[in-house]
Amino acid sequence: MAAPTAAALSTLSTASVTSGKRFITSSFSLSFSSRPLATGVRAAGARAARRSAASASTVVATIAVGDKLPDATLSYFDPADGELKTVTVAELTAGRKAVLFAVPGAFTPTCSQKHLPGFIEKAGELHAKGVDAIACVSVNDAFVMRAWKESLGLGDADVLLLSDGNLELTRALGVEMDLSDKPMGLGVRSRRYALLADDGVVKVLNLEEGGAFTTSSAEEMLKAL
């Protein structure tokens, strides 16, 4: 099947990407694991260790070049109809080259002034080098992401702004960082990164340390292509 156009990708309205699934409010049921208690304790210990590592200065991630991206559900407001919808990582990356970059937070200075604008500016060059989809991911909720997009006057910019509000993708990649000790009230966020996936397999991974912005720019991604 032919790769969708950049314009189609920007609204996720192509045949290869599910036309969008509206959020449906429903009750949830509790489920209980049958794993032995010791296994659960070990898992909890591992999670605690990873959280501790994530708050340290050294970058620790469970994703690496050559790995298949974990699937996760992200949300966004479809500019075509204004509806709140979801898309999975698999839908974004299957059978195409996709650039995903993450910012610690919408409306924060570096993210608003450099990181996101850089990818918007270089979107055409990235597409010319074979990139089919470009998406910005943040742990902010979809309402904040929409407001951020509107505040920057992005309109139909060829970069998707996706919410990972439950940190599903962020934690699956092992790139969460705990900023609870900072005065800004940011809590747990995603490290700044940019990756290129080809049919869901990571080919390039530029992961920053702390709040740095050195290797995850659009310019650095262009150099890697």
Curated annotation (Swiss-Prot):
Gene Ontology, cellular component aspect: chloroplast stroma; cytoplasm
GO molecular function terms listed in the Swiss-Prot or TrEMBL record: thioredoxin peroxidase activity
Range of the transit peptide: 1-42
Catalysed reaction equations from the record: [glutaredoxin]-dithiol + a hydroperoxide = [glutaredoxin]-disulfide + an alcohol + H2O
Keyword Chloroplast: yes
Record's subcellular location: Plastid, Chloroplast stroma
Cross-referenced PROSITE patterns: THIOREDOXIN_2
Keywords: Antioxidant, Chloroplast, Oxidoreductase, Peroxidase, Plastid, Redox-active center, Transit peptide
Keyword Plastid: yes
Gene3D superfamilies for this protein: Glutaredoxin
Residues the record marks as active site: 111 (cysteine sulfenic acid (-soh) intermediate)
SUPFAM superfamilies: Thioredoxin-like (SSF52833)
Chain ranges of the Thioredoxin domain: 63-225
Subunit structure: Monomer.
Note: The active site is a conserved redox-active cysteine residue, the peroxidatic cysteine (C(P)), which makes the nucleophilic attack on the peroxide substrate. The peroxide oxidizes the C(P)-SH to cysteine sulfenic acid (C(P)-SOH), which then reacts with another cysteine residue, the resolving cysteine (C(R)), to form a disulfide bridge. The disulfide is subsequently reduced by an appropriate electron donor to complete the catalytic cycle. In this 1-Cys peroxiredoxin, no C(R) is present and C(P) instead forms a disulfide with a cysteine from another protein or with a small thiol molecule.
Function field: Thiol-specific peroxidase that catalyzes the reduction of hydrogen peroxide and organic hydroperoxides to water and alcohols, respectively. Plays a role in cell protection against oxidative stress by detoxifying peroxides. May be involved in chloroplast redox homeostasis.
Membership in a protein family: Belongs to the peroxiredoxin family. Prx5 subfamily.
Protein name: Peroxiredoxin-2E-2, chloroplastic
The organism of origin for this protein: Oryza sativa subsp. japonica
Lineage, uppermost ranks: Eukaryota, Viridiplantae, Streptophyta, Embryophyta, Tracheophyta
